[in-house]
């Protein structure tokens, strides 16, 4: 897996960096594992926009991914590695000894023909799934459950990996990709290894059209709107926002204001908060 760039014969090809798709071995999805997925385009059940800047984009079929890895102690062979338009990670098609086929997230370095297995006694090899209690300290894992039997909920994006750093009582301590250190029940399952397509973070759309293909619409700054449309709007020329800090279109503080519930139940399981990440756009004062 790697990236591909182009000679700058147009402005967009000067900037674009795309995946070379070298690891893909099958172009058509497994029909029995795909379903039609209605795209909400940022609307709720009343048709009102609840998530701005979404809409359009290419049609997609949803691939049913096995996040639970609940087919225990039955070996499965990787028969294909495929592209999934619904996520930035690749997916692997595996065939179990009883003939059933399933999709899983493709771990880095997992090859076609490799045999994987899920269960408490599985060997510590990429693609195998085990309870956190049975995974040695220092091991890299992904697709981690937060509640036993619910299926993996965290560490699922391309290139993501968490590290097992401690075990004490009924909990295992994980260091997550965000830098957060938290406790997770020891009976929760996780998959060994790092999620594949590690170069996903190095890709560049190169042009607005590529984002439109993905269903991402333009983001208009509040300061160039009229006062009726945004609290930052109005003024003569390029006027400042006229406030002590940036706000949302509905007047709520944003870009740094804490939104986490102070009494959230999972707070007691977080040992160290995640690293701060800057979400400010150009100029640092827009939303």
Swiss-Prot record:
This is Large ribosomal subunit protein uL2. Keywords: Ribonucleoprotein, Ribosomal protein, RNA-binding, rRNA-binding. Belongs to the universal ribosomal protein uL2 family. Residues 209-220, 258-287 have a biased composition (Basic residues). GO terms for molecular function: rRNA binding; structural constituent of ribosome; transferase activity. The keyword Heme does not apply. GO terms for biological process: translation. Part of the 50S ribosomal subunit. Forms a bridge to the 30S subunit in the 70S ribosome. The gene is rplB. It comes from Nostoc sp. (strain PCC 7120 / SAG 25.82 / UTEX 2576). The lineage of its organism: Bacteria, Bacillati, Cyanobacteriota, Cyanophyceae, Nostocales. Residues 203-287 are annotated as: Disordered.
């Amino acid at each position: 897996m790697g990236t591909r760039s182009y000679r700058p014969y147009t402005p967009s090809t000067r900037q674009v960096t795309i995946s070379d798709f070298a690891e893909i071995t099958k172009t058509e999805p497994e029909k029995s594992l795909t379903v039609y997925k209605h795209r909400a385009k940022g609307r709720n059940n009343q048709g009102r926009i609840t998530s701005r800047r979404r809409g359009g984009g290419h049609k997609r079929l949803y691939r049913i991914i096995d996040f639970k890895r609940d087919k225990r102690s039955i070996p499965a062979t990787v028969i294909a590695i495929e592209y999934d338009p619904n996520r930035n990670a690749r997916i692997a098609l595996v065939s179990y000894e009883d003939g059933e086929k399933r999709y899983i997230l493709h771990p880095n370095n997992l090859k076609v023909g490799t045999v994987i297995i899920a269960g408490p006694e599985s060997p510590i090899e990429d693609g195998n799934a085990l309870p956190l209690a049975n995974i040695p300290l220092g091991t890299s894992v992904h697709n981690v459950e937060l509640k036993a039997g619910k299926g993996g909920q965290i560490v699922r994006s391309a290139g993501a990996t968490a590290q097992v750093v401690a075990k004490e009582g009924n909990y295992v301590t994980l260091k997550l990709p965000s830098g957060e250190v938290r406790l997770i029940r020891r009976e929760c399952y996780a998959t060994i290894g790092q999620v594949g397509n590690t170069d996903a973070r190095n890709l560049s759309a190169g042009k607005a059209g590529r984002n439109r293909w993905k269903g991402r619409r333009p983001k208009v700054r509040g300061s160039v709107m009229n006062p009726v449309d945004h609290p930052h709007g109005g003024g003569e020329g390029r006027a400042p926002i006229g406030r002590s800090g940036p706000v949302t279109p509905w007047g709520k503080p944003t870009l740094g204001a804490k939104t986490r519930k102070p009494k959230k139940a999972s707070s007691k399981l977080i040992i160290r908060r995640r690293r701060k990440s800057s979400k400010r756009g150009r100029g640092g004062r827009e939303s």
